[in-house]
Structure formats: C-alpha cells, structure tokens
C-alpha cells in the first residue's frame, strides 16, 4: 500500500469486500461555495451516494496525507479553511505532501488518488477542458491528460460551459477517451442539457455503462471514460442567459489578467454573481444528479 495514502475504514472495508465505492472531489468544498454551504453540500452528496447503493469516498490532501474517504470533521475542516486550501492537480501533490499541507483535489488529482486506492467510479460537477482562446494561451486542463491514462470513469454534466466544448471534445478524441452520453446523444454543457456537439455513444442504463467499463479495462485499454449526465430538466438554465453571463465573465477575466488555475474559480464565481446565484443552484443540483448515477453505475460494476 502507498505509504502516503490513508483510506478510511469504511472505504477500505467496502473495497476489500468488492462493494461499490464512488470517489468525490474536494475542490467543490474549498473553492466551490462558501462555508457552511460547502460542507453541507458535500455531506448531502455523500448521502445521495449511500441512498443509491454505494459507499462515498470524498478525496483530499489533509496535513500532508492523501485521504480517500473523509470524516464529517475533515469535510468541515476543509469547508472552514475554504480558499486557504491549495487547489491541487497532478503537479501539486508531491509539494503539498512535502510541506505537510492541505490540498483540495481537482478532477485530475481525484482520479489519481481514486486509482491508487482501487476506486473505479468518480462523480463530479463538470470536467475541466480546453479553455476558450487556447490556440493562443495553450490553457488546457490537466483533467484531460489524466483521462487519457488513468482508469477511472468520471460522471459529470459535461465539460464546464465556460470552456471551448468543441476543442475539448477533439482533445478527448485524440487521446482515445470515450465520451458517453447517459440517455442523450448530445454533449450536455454543464448548466444546460445540450450543446452543438454529439457524444460518441449514447447508453441508457447504468448496467450498459458498467459493462462497457469492464470490457475496456479487462482488455487492458488504459484510460478513463467521460460519462456525461445532463442536468435535470427542472434545474437546467436558459442557454441564451448562461451564454451571455459567460461572455461577460470572460471579458472581465481578460481585463483583470486572471489566468491558469485561478481562471475556473474566477469564472464560476463571476457567472454566479451575474445570474444572481442561479448558476450555483444549478451546479449543486447537477452534482447531486451525478452522484446518484455514479452510485448506480458502481453498484452495477461490482454486481
């Protein structure tokens, strides 16, 4: 076992017994919303995973230890620390460990820690991707590279709509990462149920998705799978309204010179401000929806 890794007793017991486990990321706790809403939301997501037949494993770095499965107290610790917690992707993990620090895991680093522990299914809000204007900036999320070679299925509401969805899709295709639509043939765009882009495959049941994952990994085809699960109709936002908010947020980001790992939190916060908090409510609901589907996929995978 990895000397830096702490797997919670509940998660360890489930993994040893071949029971379904769902990984959850921690950036949404530290960077996604303020205290105490962040911790409350994270605990609700864990409960939704349990209600749908799996064990939740929220993942983070706390005091220099890689944690797979957090206690309520650890979730609250991250929630209170908020933006003081380092947003940790692949490159950051060894340095946070070396200084005994705290890290909130992105999609990429959550996948890494999940794979270390043997967790195959991960629920998040949306994956990172190719940023708009990347042909000049080369700003491409490390999430995509992780998906290319780490064997974890990521259930999300598509790529965050602040990104260039077309280029994100092309990048995934280049790296052989399947883009699966759950009960949809078009790629959902986070706050909205559809976009101008198709998925590679539409699968309509958790069982079909689990069978495809088993076939992929049993054949030794390395890499993740993106399972795009549209936001529930009742919480989906108007496409025109959200596009206008994103355009305004992007313009302000350029004016202020925000870039790199700060760009996504800035844009999400600005879009929430412009939409009067509607985008944050939508974000929470799509995470709940993804957690439920991920638990059902994990239950089928381990059935």
Curated annotation (Swiss-Prot):
Its cofactor is Mn(2+). Keywords: Glycosidase, Hydrolase, Lyase, Manganese, Metal-binding. It comes from the Bacteria. GO terms for cellular component: cytoplasm. Substrate binds at residues 87, 107, 141-143. It holds the Pfam family Indigoidine_A. One of its GO terms (molecular function) is metal ion binding. Its EC number is 4.2.1.70. InterPro entries: Indigdn_synthA-like, PsuG. GO terms for biological process: nucleobase catabolic process. It catalyses: D-ribose 5-phosphate + uracil = psi-UMP + H2O. SUPFAM superfamilies: Indigoidine synthase A-like. The keyword Ubl conjugation does not apply. Catalyzes the reversible cleavage of pseudouridine 5'-phosphate (PsiMP) to ribose 5-phosphate and uracil. Functions biologically in the cleavage direction, as part of a pseudouridine degradation pathway. Belongs to the pseudouridine-5'-phosphate glycosidase family. PANTHER family: CARBOHYDRATE KINASE PFKB DOMAIN-CONTAINING PROTEIN (PTHR42909:SF1), ZGC:136858 (PTHR42909). This is Pseudouridine-5'-phosphate glycosidase. It comes from Hahella chejuensis (strain KCTC 2396).
């Amino acid at each position: 076992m990895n000397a830096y890794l702490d797997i919670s007793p509940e998660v360890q017991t489930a993994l040893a017994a071949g029971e379904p486990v769902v990984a959850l990321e921690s950036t949404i706790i530290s960077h996604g919303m303020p205290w105490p809403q962040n911790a409350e939301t994270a605990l609700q997501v864990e409960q939704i995973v349990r209600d749908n037949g799996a064990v939740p494993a929220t993942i983070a770095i706390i005091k220099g230890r890689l944690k797979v499965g957090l206690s309520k107290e650890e979730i609250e610790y991250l929630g209170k620390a908020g933006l003081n917690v380092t947003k940790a992707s692949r490159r950051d993990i060894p340095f946070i460990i070396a200084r005994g620090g705290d890290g909130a895991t992105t999609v990429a680093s959550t996948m890494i820690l999940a794979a270390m522990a043997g967790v195959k299914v991960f629920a998040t809000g949306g994956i990172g991707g190719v940023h708009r204007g990347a042909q000049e900036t080369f700003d491409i999320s490390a999430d995509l590279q992780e998906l290319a070679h780490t064997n974890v299925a990521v259930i999300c509401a598509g790529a965050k709509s602040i990104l260039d969805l077309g280029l994100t899709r092309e990048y995934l295709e280049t790296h052989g990462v399947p883009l699966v639509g759950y009960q949809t043939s078009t790629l959902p765009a986070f706050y909205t149920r559809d976009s101008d882009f198709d998925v590679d495959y539409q699968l309509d049941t958790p069982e079909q998705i689990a069978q495809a994952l088993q076939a992929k990994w049993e054949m030794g085809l390395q890499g993740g799978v993106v399972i795009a699960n549209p936001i529930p109709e009742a919480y989906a936002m108007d496409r025109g309204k959200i596009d206008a908010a994103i355009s305004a947020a992007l313009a302000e980001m350029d004016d202020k010179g925000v870039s790199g790992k700060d760009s996504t939190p800035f844009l999400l916060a600005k879009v929430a401000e412009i939409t009067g908090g509607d985008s944050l409510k939508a974000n929470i609901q799509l995470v709940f929806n993804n957690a439920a589907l991920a638990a059902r996929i994990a239950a089928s995978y381990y059935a």
